[in-house]
């Protein structure tokens, strides 16, 4: 490729950054001079969070101690923070509770969904290409409830549905390829079959509109350490549509979800509303870290984030095509906007050494064995110059590593 063409792409990147309505958000994050394209695995640290966490440790815990459960709002944090997440996934207040891990929330959601579905339905459909933990948990839930697990490709779900289908567990965005699945259409198909839809939003929340209420989703789960920037191991969340809350029967009925948690009665009586999704004492330090991190979303429209995400991934793919010799990489991320999340996955036979050298040169992505390079584009802090630089460095690295086989 000529230097003139490279200069043209660099100039375009600078112009795009200059007109980016989200460009100012980058300064809200602790970033170095490198290119961070792994926000689909762990989001960057918002710069104001350490001071907020210090207050939690020194004043709320250190000085107020037990009083902070009331005076600092610790007890109500799971629902309060859930209401902060709600508009980011298209949900009204009162339907999301924060706490536990994604795996635990998947278990709660799938078992509760099977119970909502009722008698006569004994199959749980699960995305056959799912992130492994969802498959493990769904299999355990099936054993516990006496259901049969049916792994199914998302494209085949409508044909696989039937009168025995109780629950369908799907990923909104595929963690490996970045494919965006048809949440509205698949949810409608699940409902038409009389089943309950459970969605995993780990790779979509904070990257694109979800529309939980608009599309009638029954239950959903998601993590908060990717595009929501809640920090390593930050608590996950559980969405229970208001219409299902009275029937939500958690398989983990802990004291925190009791109607009178301090009554200490031997019998369990569930609380009303989203509180039913709680289990035990919340992880307050991680939870309040997440609450502070969510401040970066103030004044940001998810539609604006989505528009930039698509523009970034389009531009990155254009730069890869321009810089990288044919045959070295092949995109496994759909080109169609309606089918693309906020990452680009490139198949590359030399994925491990390539990613290692990219990171050494300041371009941080990750890989999924054996041969997929993943580049996550977090619109709040990734710019177009980052996309151009990442593609350029990728080409330089590939020029140094002999090909070992076809990429496609």
Model feature map: region roles:
Residues 1-408:
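Pyridoxal 5′-phosphate
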